[in-house]
Amino acid sequence: MVLGEGAAVFALEKGSSPRALATIRGIGYASEPITHPVAISADAEALRRSMQQALEGIDPKEVDVVIPHATGTLKGDQAEYLALAEVFGTELPLLTTNKWKIGHTFAASGALAMEMAVLMLQQQHFLLVPYLPATPERPLRNILINATGFGGNAVSVLISEK
């Protein structure tokens, strides 16, 4: 794991606004008992449930990109990948991350991933990861962001173009 530092700030408004850069379409939160305070379970149960909550009433095929929490730990990344496969099946959306460039920023990582997602929607530009070459087949409309925290917590947020 490569460590980094950073911060991001968002102004949220209820309802629709002409100034909005994106729209929060779904939010999920789940927690699970774990055996180590800084780990997730081998099947990433909390992440699976948080993604399912964020996608409630939405066809998973509508998700264009997922920004996984993916800290660069073998067990954690594998567990998150298994949870993604359970939610999306064999047709995973495009995957990307900013951690290969800035490292894992701990508490700021979810906000920085959200910022990256908003910029991708605004600019209609998918940010490639060197080891995961991919090209979007359609305009970017929906991006799912995953974040996990100490103690077995997981949050997923689906944002859409405004």
Predicted regions and their residues:
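Condensing-enzyme catalytic core mediating Claisen C-C bond formation in acyl metabolism
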Residues: 1-65
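Generic secondary-structure signature for well-ordered alpha-helical cores
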Residues: 16-17, 29, 56, 60, ...
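A generic structural signal for alpha->beta connector loops
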Residues: 21, 91-92
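A general structural motif
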Residues: 60-63, 92, 140
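Short glycine-rich or small-residue beta-strand-to-loop segments that form or flank ligand, phosphate
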Residues: 66-69, 145
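Charged helix-capping and loop-helix junction motifs
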Residues: 80-83
